[in-house]
Every structure is written in C-alpha cells, then in structure tokens.
C-alpha cells in the first residue's frame, strides 16, 4: 500500500522501523505536490534506508506502509534472513555495543603490539612486516566504520548516511585490494627474501588507488553498473591471486641446495600451509557465519563473523610474518656466506 507522509524538511532520512511504525508517523491521504521531486536511494544490503529529496517546503513525501496497521509485528528480511524488530531494538542492545568496543580495542591493542615487536626486532625486520602495520590500521578503521554504520542504520541520527557509507565502501575496497597486493608480493618473496625493485611498491599502490577512485566515482554518481562490474572482477580476481600465490610458493619450496635456501624453504612452506588453509577455510567460515546468522541472534552472528575475519585477515598473516622467524633466515644467511668465503 502507498501512503503520503507530510514533511517540512528539505531532506528526510529515517530508519526502517520508524517509517513503518504506525505510532511514529502521520497517517492519512494527503495531497501531493506535483512540483516536488522525490528520489529513492538504496545502498546495497542497507537498502532499508531511504533518502527523499524535496524541492519545496511544505510538499509531501511518498512512503510505503505494511498491510497490517500494527507496524511493530513484522520481520525484516535482511540479507535473506528474517530478523524481527525485537532482535535489534531491545533493552539488551548495550551489551553488544560494549562487545563491539572490546573488539575494536583488541584490534588496536594487537596493532600496538605489532608495532612494538617491529621496533624490538628493528635490525632484522623485513619491509613486508612494516607494511603489515598499515594493513592492520586499515582493518581497524574499516571495522570501526562498520560498527558506526550498524548503529546508524537503525537510528535517525545519521543525516549524511549515504556519504558516510561511501567512505566505508572505499576504505573496505582499499583494504581488500591492499591485502591482495600484499599476498602476491609475499608469495613472490618481495620484501622478505628478495629486495623490492625500485618503484614496484609505488606502482602497485598507484593501481589500487586508481581503482578506488573509479569505484568511489561509481558510488557517488550512482553508476551501479560500474559497481557491479567491480564486484564481479573482485570475486574473479581474488581466487586467481590465491591460486597463483600457492603455485608460486610450491615452486619456491623446492629449492633446498644451501643453508640459506633451506631456511627460505621452511619459511615459504609455513607460508604455503597458511595460504592453503585460508584459501580452503574462508568459504567454509563464511558459510558457517551465515548459518549462525539465520539461527541465532543477529548481533552474535556479526561478532562471530568478525572473529572469523580477524583470524583470516590478521592472525594468520601475522603468524607467518612474525619477526622472530627472521632470526633463522639471518643466521642461515650468515652461515651460507661464511661457507662460500671458505671455499674461495
């Protein structure tokens, strides 16, 4: 059913529950101003938000209402799962907020520990291990924005939600592609056992920034075709990068002729095992998260999904690249150099 809601604001942006709750809105058949302009805007899975732009003050906005007059008794179909209003708007919501803050604090604490470790092993640190600090920072910023968006989705306090969500999308796109760039560079050994060629990192980051710029323009200008193309490319490119990295690591592990190469082989073998585990376990973890989402509390499923993401994106890369592993490489490199000098 279609209803008309009277408004005096130039921009109206309310939550799904407030729009459809009959107790919080004005009901009735109002006159519609033909000179006003109404625009419906949805943001991917958060299309429960709507922005209606009005040219003239005192005009009327079109809104939809459920068939039942009791707007509180309905389920929200969110990402294919039925979530009732009581699961999101309840008195115990503060507990989940504290848990979310604890998650962010844990990520920032882990970032601080990683920075301290890099400073402690500064003499034998790899360039790739310094880059991890930037990636963890992007991950923490991305998760923080995600938590803020989830808070604003079900409230009417966010006036510029669309711009806020675009910033989150760009940072998430940047973090994802930066992670893929880091994976392929590590698989090739750059910044670990091979020196980084001049301007190689700059070229890679420039490509990522250029892709982010095009993606941002597509979001800001509502070019959803470009967004869909980018999403399709991401889903196709990511498995290809993982498969190529795994194949290249298999090749690296076969070189065991000297002490140094033996140490490299152990290092790359550890990286190979982690890459295979992440590549195989990632779809299973996401599937398990979706099952939890459909059968348990919405907030609980989000927290478990964040835990899986932390293990996949942060814990395993940091385990592989932990600076204490550098001592074996440095030691065996010196042994190989001394053996070569004795032969000369």
Curated annotation (Swiss-Prot):
Pfam family, one: Pombe_5TM
Intracellular or extracellular location(s): Endoplasmic reticulum; Membrane
Membrane association type: Multi-pass membrane protein
Cytoplasmic-facing ranges: 1-98, 142-198, 244-273
GO CC annotations, alphabetized: endoplasmic reticulum; membrane
Membrane spanning residue stretches: 99-119, 121-141, 199-219, 223-243, 274-294
Keyword terms, alphabetized: Endoplasmic reticulum, Membrane, Transmembrane, Transmembrane helix
Membrane topology (Lumenal): 120, 220-222, 295-344
Top-level taxon: Eukaryota
Main location: endoplasmic reticulum
Family: Belongs to the UPF0742 family.
Name of protein: Uncharacterized membrane protein SPBC1348.02
Organism of derivation: Schizosaccharomyces pombe (strain 972 / ATCC 24843) (Fission yeast)
